[in-house]
Amino acid sequence: MVDEAQELTDAEWQMLLLRCPSRSFTVVGDRAQARHGFTETWQERLRRIGLERITMASLTVNYRTPAEVMAEAEPVIRAALPDANVPTSIRGSGLPVVREKVAKLAEILEEWLAANAEGVACVIGHPGFAERARVRSLTPTLAKGLEFDLVILVDPERFGDGVEGAVDRYVAMTRATQRLVILTS
């Protein structure tokens, strides 16, 4: 099983091929989350690194991220990767994406913590923010693969330019399982 396969370099693939002479892998990856770009199709990439018998299946259903969040996240990734596989959310949270100023960060967190006895929030993109009980502080890269009830993005346009910046914004947005808040300076 190879997870996050979109991030592997050719050298890393060669290492895996040496350790698995049968060349039988289950490969899981998302081109929309490839920070350093992924211009090939999966078929092209896997053939290029030496795999020949390839059976593909694409995930089309998103169980984690509510429709309200995906409606904001999809255009972000499609602007950089128009053919990205963006799965369809099967549920809504009933909570709209909120846009506010960075000055509202503490107030938004306090209100959420008071209203939610359980769950974890994550502030993404604010390096000076101090973690506390039930509130994490991460970079977009470190948030990859994780999920949080509330995600607060701080100045997401500062996450970078081009494909890498778009991927970081998309990944950060899609960590939300209930609510997304986008704060700008």
Where is each model-derived feature located?
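Walker B beta-strand of ABC/ABC-like P-loop ATPase nucleotide-binding domains
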Residues: M1-V2
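Conserved helicase motor core of SF1/SF2 NTP-dependent helicases
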Residues: Q6-S185
